[in-house]
Amino acid sequence: MSVTIDPRRHDAVLFDTALNSTQALVRQLQQARVGTATFASGGGGHDAAIQALIESADRVGARPGRCVVITADAASVAAARDSGFALVIGVDQAGHRDALPDHGADTVLADLDEVRVRAGDRHMSELPDALQALGRPDGLTVPRPAVFFDFDGTLSEIVDDPDAATPTAGAVAALQQLAAQCPVAILSGRDLADVSQRVGLPGIWYAGSHGFELTAPDGTHHQNEAAAAAIPVLEQAAAQLRDRLGSIPGVMVEHKRFGVATHYRNAARNRVGKIAAVVRAAGQRDGLRVTTGREVIELHPDIDWDKGKTLRWVIDHLPDQRAAPLVPIYLGDDITDEDAFDAVGPNGVAIMVRHNEDGDRATAALFALESPARVAEFTGRLASQLSTLG
């Protein structure tokens, strides 16, 4: 069994000083521009273990929600889990393999040779501008595209209250122009009914809950039946999270049909670790998958399905590809959009909508846009370009 450290999701790795043979992995991480730091495990109790981890993350300038902890110490595993670290890897150096997952390890390895490091991605600041590249022979030219958009942070600005989000000025008109030229789809983490109502444009694809539920341009409804079995579990998890987190100012627990999103954008920064820890514990208890995003942590059915697989499913169900295959273009801003960036493949186009909430993180995207307003402008220009091609 192996585990992958992904620079798109992880800014730093914290190593227990008691671990053996860390040098080779440290070199791989440095080559991938992932920070590294150490902490001493053992002694001092639970609060001291948490403090040691937080101080180690601070030294490398990373927040716990984007840090990996690797340790052979069960107490350090528990401390990392309770303080909201993104990934907790246990290493069985002393024959106590069962104790590590019992304390909250995401995975347990025999040694560090089983750790992989994703390589080859660029950072957001290094990407060329998609608007400047559009239509240039050496830039971005796609004569037969199918264009996919995230909603929040891509077609809409990120706002403090998710219920207040609306498409940015000109976005819906540009989408309508584009839909007259090629297939268009909105892939959102929101409920299907929510995102389709906010955009309000007929004749395009809508996918809600990261693709667990879709409607086609003709109104045909599709859902992941395996995911539907988890709906009662998600309802129960939402109620329990409201009980556990509802008293924390600035936290909002949103129950969706195929997910539970805990928003903490308006919460105090020193409460975020606890919030994440509570959600991760709920996911582990209820057998649900945990995903993260911009100031949100979510629970989903534990099924191998994401925006990338949704994109490929939609492509496979689009008509009129006999003359030439459609080329996917995907525009998104968040970690969950990286699955779609991967899925467009070497012939597709992935476009990141830049932000600074995760620093200058790595991404699989090929191009970037500066804001949702630029997304609307790009969409309109792409529609005009396609109309001239006939």
Swiss-Prot record:
Pfam family, one: Trehalose_PPase
Record-listed substrate binding positions: 150-152
Catalysed reaction, written as an equation: alpha,alpha-trehalose 6-phosphate + H2O = alpha,alpha-trehalose + phosphate
Pathway terms, separated by semicolons: Glycan biosynthesis; trehalose biosynthesis
Cofactors, names only: Mg(2+)
Enzyme Commission identifier(s): 3.1.3.12
Active site: 150 (nucleophile)
Gene Ontology terms describing biological process: trehalose biosynthetic process
Matching CDD domains: HAD_TPP
The keyword Manganese is annotated on this UniProt entry: no
InterPro entries: HAD-like_sf, HAD-SF_hydro_IIB, HAD_sf, OTSB-like, Trehalose_PPase
Binding-site residues for Mg(2+), renumbered to this chain: 150, 152, 333
Entry GO MF terms: metal ion binding; trehalose-phosphatase activity
Enzyme class: hydrolase
Keyword entries, A-Z: Hydrolase, Magnesium, Metal-binding
General function of this protein: Removes the phosphate from trehalose 6-phosphate to produce free trehalose.
PANTHER family xrefs: TREHALOSE 6-PHOSPHATE PHOSPHATASE (PTHR43768:SF3)
Family, per entry: Belongs to the trehalose phosphatase family.
The protein's name in its UniProt record: Trehalose-phosphate phosphatase
Gene: otsB
